[in-house]
Amino acid sequence: MRRVMLVVLLLASSPAWPGWVQMSSEGAGSIMYADPDTIKIDGQLRRVTELHDFKAPDKTRGNRSTKVVSEYDCKEGRIRILQEEYFSGQMGAGERLGGSTEPTDWFSLAPGTRGWTLLNFVCSR
């Protein structure tokens, strides 16, 4: 019984997905994570891999999670998406449902948003 309890405690105290740092709560129907080990620095620009994990399947694509490579402009407070991959399961698991490697246009981030939180996180590195 003690061994079972020890295993349960060890599993509960260890991170479920190494590398992912939770950046937002579930308030908006999804939780956003960033992997600090993937941050690439080029002057005022930062690239990072993010994971957007949805409570329910996305209404547009039916995916439960999206892996995103984003580029942040620390000086201008803006972001663009460089790459996206859509997955049927949570936390990037399951079948790959598609994706995009077409970079989006830059767009500004407003203070207090989840994107602003990510900008501050990656730009502090």
Locations of regions flagged by a protein language model:
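N-terminal secretory-pathway/extracellular module detecting exported/lumenal segments
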Residues: 15-125
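Sec-dependent N-terminal signal peptides
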Residues: 4-12
